[in-house]
Amino acid sequence: MILILLFLTAITVITVRLYRKVLRFPPGPFPLPLIGNAHQIAYQAWRRGGILPALDYYRKKYGNAYTLWLGPKASVSITDFETSQEVFVKQGKKCYNRQLAPILEHVTGGVGLLIANGENWAEMRRFTLLTFRQMGVGTNIMEKRIMDELNGRCLEIDAQIARNDRAIVDVKFFDLTVGSVINSFLIGKRFEDEEEFLKIKKLFDESSETFNIFDLNVPVWFLKTFLPSRFKLTWDSRHQIMDHVMKGVEERIRDIESGAYKIDPKKPNDVVDAFLSKMKKEEEIAGGQHPYYNLKSLKLVLHDLWLAGQGTTATTLYVGFMKLVNHPGIIQNIQKELLDITENGARDLTLKDRPNTPYLNATIAEIQRHASILNVNFWRINHETIHFNDYQVDPGTMIAAQVGVLHVNEELFDNPKDFNVEKYLKNPKLLQQVIPFGIGKRSCVGEQIAKSELYLVFGNILLRYNVKKHGSTPTNEDVYPYSSAKLPDVSGKLEFVKL
């Protein structure tokens, strides 16, 4: 009897303490001790066919800021632009660290750009932004890199058209184009060998299966013990990718040591040049290995930049064209706009043309809204109290702008399931509320490169070719709807015909 009373007393105390904690946060379903809202999230995801519809269900029920408890941890999701701006920009200094997924931190050691915090992350971000500036990101130099790759791929398309009056294009065209651009920035080489690229792309796609709320939050020991195959998939795929990107680094180091290659520290050809130069300088100052500028950090920085720079942009291009071929009127409007400003196609579209292409800009924004690559965004951890909308978020809370939910928020975008370009022309402020690259201090470091790729590739392909669907187009439904990363059906094909 005494044991029962003690047990009931303990449960009562835990529940009362939990209730008091819950009251301080934005509204949400009431959590259970230990498991939080895990059972409710799983049920809603199953019932609604994915994690994104489940999170959108909670938005509709509780508002644009709501709380879900992942076990004993509170997570606050923000799903509108104004509040995201308030929390992650105006109060961004209070929450720049990420909640690191145990399995990914185990794989990376907390090093790099994506799965890192503190001074390590800050130093690598500063280095990357400085290196991009030195390499001409935002200038004609970057534009030339992108256009050289696109022109090379289009020569292959033109050869097909010359033989067959049309070219059949699938997702590989976009994957290889974007993959070669990012590879040229990272290690100065385009992908000449298609099989080499497809191998590394397959590894990234496989690792997406375990990129979900469950795998990213349970302890490593749990995965190793009870789900060893899932642990192995994440571990093996990430390390094989890292081993792949390091092959070029090892080759570069051998060439430097033999005198066959020299680095100009003021004008690096790629990220590897810049990093090796900085590493040498820091080692000379420190008299030994630097804690941040070492080969392990280089490996993780290359991995993170490749992951962030290839899959997201290539997927957006593929999804975008699959949307456009079902809206031929939009393609015609874009082509008319482009022909008008390029003297009837006498020259390529350039980044300087952006202010004069409002229809293309609006179309790209709508494509990015629909493509939304992440179903669940990385949570951050606030180290100071955050106040917004009469709520108080205590230090140590997980908090995120859930961009995927924001992009289907009918309060911001009328009829969000529809593909509608006109709304941005009627209300240009909506362009700012499409935030596929995130918001605040942890926004995508390669945002400028990705935006330039999207504009130049979409624009110049539509300036050169009539694009139509070849057979039926996939629905663009998520292949892994319970994953944190969206992976669309990529079985669709396109027909390119010369204008």
Swiss-Prot record:
Iron recorded as keyword: yes
CC cofactor: heme
EC numbers, comma separated: 1.14.-.-
Chain residues that bind heme: 444
Gene Ontology MF terms in the entry: heme binding; iron ion binding; oxidoreductase activity, acting on paired donors, with incorporation or reduction of molecular oxygen, reduced flavin or flavoprotein as one donor, and incorporation of one atom of oxygen
Coiled-coil regions listed: none
Pfam families: p450
InterPro entries assigned: Cyt_P450, Cyt_P450_CS, Cyt_P450_E_grp-I, Cyt_P450_sf, Cytochrome_P450_fam2
CDD domains listed in its UniProt record: CYP1_2-like
Record keywords: Iron, Metal-binding, Monooxygenase, Oxidoreductase
One GO CC term on file: intracellular membrane-bounded organelle
Disruption phenotype: RNAi-mediated knockdown causes a reduction in the quantity of a hydroxylated thiabendazole (TBZ) metabolite and probably its glucose conjugate.
Gene Ontology biological process terms from the UniProt entry: organic acid metabolic process; xenobiotic metabolic process
SUPFAM superfamilies: Cytochrome P450 (SSF48264)
Superkingdom, natural source: Eukaryota
Expression sites (tissue/organ): Expressed in hypodermis, intestine and vulva upon thiabendazole (TBZ) exposure.
The keyword Metal-binding is assigned to this record: yes
Function: Cytochromes P450 are a group of heme-thiolate monooxygenases. They oxidize a variety of structurally unrelated compounds, including steroids, fatty acids, and xenobiotics. Involved in the oxidative metabolism of thiabendazole (TBZ). Catalyzes the conversion of TBZ to its hydroxylated form.
Family per similarity comment: Belongs to the cytochrome P450 family.
Protein's recorded name: Probable cytochrome P450 cyp-35D1
Gene it is expressed from: cyp-35d1
